[in-house]
UniProtKB/Swiss-Prot annotation:
Originating species: Leifsonia xyli subsp. xyli (strain CTCB07)
Domain of life assignment: Bacteria
TM ranges: none
Pfam family, one: Pur_DNA_glyco
Key words, A-Z: DNA damage, DNA repair, Hydrolase
InterPro entries hit by this protein: Formyl_transferase-like_C_sf, MPG, MPG_sf
Protein name (Swiss-Prot/TrEMBL): Putative 3-methyladenine DNA glycosylase
GO biological process, one term: base-excision repair
Enzyme Commission numbers on file: 3.2.2.-
Length: 213
């Protein structure tokens, strides 16, 4: 990102739009989480948009509200965190007015504060060294590096212990099909993955074997 791009804290109304509008605006944004261990901040480089009921076959809200996706229907600017594949947590920014399910999955980021803490979290018990580009490259890795867990589901991203700053200028970005989404939702009709070209922290595209279209 150019050094002349400034960051500012948005109002909640910045997230009232659909995830399709909010997703590219989050590229270059900085998400900060301060836990008991200390702060970690990430510059977002890759996201995916998911919309609501009956509109997006790749969305958790496609068939309506459940206990699991309740936060997705909540106040915009909050966190929707969920457990996936029996082992990983993923983090999303809730968009659209409350009652309309819409969210942006955080897929990749660069650590810009708290690098040592992010490295310890990602190394875990193994203590192995993780390349810096891989610390938050992919949604599950991003969550671990940031210290986000299921207990944060529904948390306000615009208030402590979180903080979210948006760039003053929209950076150039690329789009394409979403990663690992099965069925039509993973096809070319839903090019709702957005990323900053040339950023090392952007995860490689992986087509789901059951995606089509």
């Amino acid at each position: 990102m150019s050094s002349d791009v400034t960051l500012a804290q948005p109002g909640r109304d910045a997230f009232l739009a659909s995830s399709l509008e909010v997703a590219p605006r989050l590229l270059g944004a900085v998400l900060r989480h301060e836990s008991a261990e200390g702060p970690v901040a990430l510059r977002i480089t890759e996201v995916e948009a998911y919309t609501g009921e009956g509109l997006d076959p790749g969305s958790h809200a496609f068939r309506g509200p459940t206990r699991r996706n309740a936060a997705m229907y909540g106040e915009p600017g909050r966190l929707y965190a969920y457990f996936t594949y029996g082992m990983h947590v993923c983090a999303n920014v809730v968009c659209s007015p409350a009652g309309e399910a819409s969210a942006v999955l955080l897929r990749g980021a660069e650590i810009v504060e708290g690098l040592a803490l992010a490295e310890r979290r990602r190394a875990g018990a193994s203590g192995r060294r993780i390349p810096q580009r891989d610390l938050a490259r992919g949604p599950a890795r991003l969550v671990v590096a940031a210290g986000i867990g299921l207990a944060d589901d529904g948390a306000d991203l615009l208030a402590p212990p979180f903080g979210l700053l948006l760039p003053s200028v929209q950076p150039e970005y690329a789009t394409g099909p979403r990663t690992g989404v099965s069925g039509a939702g993973g096809g070319a009709a839903f090019p709702w993955r957005y990323w900053l070209p040339g950023e090392p922290s952007v995860s490689p595209y992986k087509r789901h074997p059951a995606s089509h279209g």
